[in-house]
Regions:
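Contiguous, well-folded functional domains in the mature portion of proteins
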Residues: 1-212
């Protein structure tokens, strides 16, 4: 990982500290004008703190081949492609936790960044046209899968700390996307899904399904 093992052990993601300080500064200045404006500034601080929160998560122990949700949010795609591979997409609104997690035990085989647009991440075409970062993995059994961090209408920065050659456990935090986004999973043919369209999931806790 591009960061140390203690990087994500704080209740607030460290990437959010500069934003929290700026919001706190704005709130302080607003209090100089009026209490009402100052309270609005405190709401801004609360929003930023909430966005970058890092709540503790208990990663499920089984079953073998389980796929853990890589993000908090709502399932907007859960389907089998004509090729037989299975696609799951999770949309994160600005109130969800935005840290992204590794879905399976495996080794990172590739990381690729794609520049692009910033349309609403809930649209299907966002997966192909928006700024995104693809992480490819291979399990111990040789199954390949990819997860793609997709920037959204508000999101303007994708952070990914996973590196090729690393072996990571399911539930490991590997990055985040700032202020509204989406994560796409491309899973092997024969994957059994345990979630449905519209379902709300929690990163690192909800089991999306099992690998073949």
């Amino acid at each position: 990982m591009k960061v140390g093992p203690d990087h994500f052990r704080t209740p607030i993601a460290r990437e959010g500290i500069p934003f929290i300080l700026v919001a706190g500064g704005i709130a302080s200045v607003l209090f100089l004008f009026s209490k009402v404006l100052g309270l609005l500034g405190l709401l801004l601080v609360a929003f930023v703190v909430n966005f970058f929160r890092n709540p503790p998560r208990q990663v499920p122990a089984g079953p073998p081949g389980r796929i853990v949700s890589p993000a908090d949010g709502k399932i907007v795609v859960a389907e089998t492609a004509p090729t037989g591979r299975v696609k799951v997409s999770i949309f994160m609104n600005v109130f969800n936790v935005h840290l992204n997690r590794i879905p399976v035990d495996g080794t990172v085989t590739g990381v690729t960044y794609f520049p692009g647009a910033f349309m609403n991440a809930s649209f299907d075409k966002a997966s192909e046209q928006n700024e995104r970062n693809r992480v490819e993995m291979r399990t111990e059994k040789g199954e390949s899968l990819t997860m793609v961090q997709v920037a959204g209408l508000v999101a303007r920065r994708i952070l990914c700390y996973a590196e090729p050659g690393e072996t990571l456990s399911a539930g490991t935090i590997y990055g985040l996307i700032r202020f509204g986004s989406r994560v796409d999973l491309d899973l092997p043919a024969g994957t059994t899904l345990a979630v449905r369209l519209g379902e709300t999931v929690k990163g690192g806790e909800t089991i999306l399904g099992t690998l073949p």
